[in-house]
UniProtKB/Swiss-Prot annotation:
Lipidation (S-palmitoyl cysteine): 771
Motif (YXXL motif): 719-722
Lineage: Viruses, Riboviria, Pararnavirae, Artverviricota, Revtraviricetes
Entry's transmembrane regions: 692-712
Cellular component GO terms held in the UniProt record: host cell endosome membrane; host cell plasma membrane; membrane; viral envelope; virion membrane
Name of the molecule in the record: Envelope glycoprotein gp160
UniProt site positions, description: Cleavage: 518-519
Region (CD4-binding loop): 374-384
Amino acid sequence: MRVMGIRMNYQHLWKWGIMLLGILMTCSVAEDLWVTVYYGVPVWKEATTTLFCASDAKSYEPEAHNIWATHACVPTDPNPREIEMENVTENFNMWKNNMVEQMHEDIISLWDQNLKPCVKLTPLCVTLNCTNAGGNKTTNGNNTTNQEEQMMEKGEMKNCSFNITTVISDKKKQVHALFYRLDVVPIDDDNSANTSNTNYTNYRLINCNTSAITQACPKVTFEPIPIHYCAPAGFAILKCKDKKFNGTGPCKKVSTVQCTHGIRPVVSTQLLLNGSLAEEEIIIRSENLTNNVKTIIVHLNESVEINCTRPDNKITRQSTPIGLGQALYTTRIKGDIRQAYCNISAAAWNKTLQQVAKKLGDLLNQTTIIFKPPAGGDPEITTHSFNCGGEFFYCNTSRLFNSTWNSSTWNNDTLNSEGTIKLPCRIKQIINMWQGVGKAMYAPPIEGLIKCTSNITGLLLTRDGGVNNSTNETFRPGGGDMKDNWRNELYKYKVVRIEPLGIAPTRAKRRVVEREKRAIGLGAVFLGFLGAAGSTMGAVSVALTGQARQLLSGIVQQQNNLLRAIEAQQHMLQLTVWGIKQLQARVLAVESYLKDQQLLGIWGCSGKHICTTTVPWNSSWSNKSLEEIWNNMTWIEWEREIDNYTGVIYSLIENSQIQQEKNEQDLLQLDKWASLWNWFSITKWLWYIKIFIMIVGGLIGLRIVFTVLSLVNRVRQGYSPLSFQTLLPAPRGPDRPEGIEEEGGEQGRDRSIRLVNGFSALFWDDLRNLCLFSYHRLRDLILIATRIVELLGRRGWEAIKYLWSLLQYWTQELKNSFISLLNATAIAVAEGTDRIIELIRRAFRAVLHIPRRVRQGLERALL
């Protein structure tokens, strides 16, 4: 009755409880998603890494010690692979490309390394007594179509004498040498003033007070050889194939390559030589076209040939000793000195400049484009400086950049330009090194005639500042920062790091923990399966095995090539820049492979392409449905969406695997009981224990809830408890008197227990009552379960006995019926047999009586 009263008082609570139970049951059957690890997915991230070089150095002269040291590179692949990536859009930025920085550092290191063993010209920082050597030219040479070789201006070369220390340190001797005027500067002192009336003037080398001068070794050549930059294993090079790509922004035509195309490290200013060409139209590239400080790179679509010549002035190289075991190689000229020059086709140049002007006018919305010579600066900037046959040319380009174009001229297809543009050039032997401040190089003279033919494939321009509302824009040739030269070739490349480990939600959950014996051969991918980067996640996941087979084999092949290149340098006292990079590439490949395998081992996924886990998928990472993820998204899109949570997911997988290994160890320790209780699964026992704990916890929770509800109900009825302690009725003993004399009627046997003071006593009393309550309920539950089992056993035994007796009865009935059937059959057969025998006997008798009947008939007839 008490229970029924509580149910009636809290009927609405029962309804809410039933509703809550239904909601929990509905949620419990909802679809659960689990984290699954995939190895070999086509995912990448932007990265910076050490690139190594590949070059076909065997096709060039083997005897020459080329400064680029391409003999130390790995051989180029005769069949380079390029994998198209469909449905992939990638962002490129040529102005923030680490490949440019790396190439710049490599070229600087190569120059420094090749010049390190060469002679230092510090002893030459002495006073030079110089006179003019040869050259009687008086014309200004402004005729742009005159191709005859012109004489060098008077004073262009100096015949200098100076004192040098001999092998014996306390003795000096005077020697003579020829220097170009650009390589020496006059000394303004008293001695020069005293000799002003003579033909001698005091000079010094131009770099003596600012730079350390090193003479290039005699056998060093500067002819550029194409260098291919290659990514190590675990990395890839993405290439933009958009023909109109300006170097920054998204590119929708992306492919992946192992190495770049052959890049010639041509060191030049104003004009870019022997590079690649734009495939369709001229491309203008600038970090900010409206900022006149930024350099503008013009990528031509058609090359313009430039032919440069230094006439044979009967130049010979003479060796001048400047110290113990050191020699200065100077120039000796017999006869007149003719000037170096370069020739460019006027028609080809004007056509190119016309297209450049039109392109600049369209981009800047200007009606007039003006080209002017440089305003001033170092000779390397004001002239077109480059290396030709070992000599460093400085050519005046004022005849190339001295024109004005407007909408009427740049749209004119019939330009009157004939003949050849001739650029006067000067030669320097003391070169300001472009690698940095404070370095200079002395280039020994080259004997004989020098000719070189190059292709102009780009321009370096700067824009003049001024009034913004002007309709005219003035551009001048520039350069000097060699990074711009490399950018014009590397604008379409970027290096990415392959992330072969992918995580995604699936319905599969790891059920059985198995220890793998060994890991399969999976390495860091560098090319191969990136062709599937544009496919959906579901399409890629079914082909992971085939994709992963290429990985380790690619690493091994690349490692062998690098090792052969390193072994080829063992005869050298030190490795070149390329050798160091090859060693770094080998280390990077191994590190990348071991890192991935370590993660797979920590997660318990060694040797698996697809590995399920016990980590539930959290919708806060991504709330997309499975169908939307696997059917509509690519792996790279998915990776970018969950990139912020990969670290958290990795740690959860690791912690889950650690816990799983602990559980496995515990299970192995309990496995000895399986022989005794093999009809039960150990995991089931753990499940039973969990259910038992849940039931006990539920009972305790219900006890607390009902206690609180009872207290609230009494408060609502006007009863205020003395304390937070709930007073439970305690039954009186049978030997205690009940009530007092004044009380009448039947009294109950309940009384209130005493109150306790203090928090500890109150807590202990409540805890004891709660434990007693749980014990009593559990005891009642066990008794009820025992009675149920006993009742079910008794009823079951009675049912079995009834079924057994019923079986015996029906068996007996079937036996009797079968016997009766046999008896009836036997009787029927016997009776039928008797009748047949009787009929046969009667028939036989009838046959036997036929003669008698015939005789009797005849007798009657005769009577």
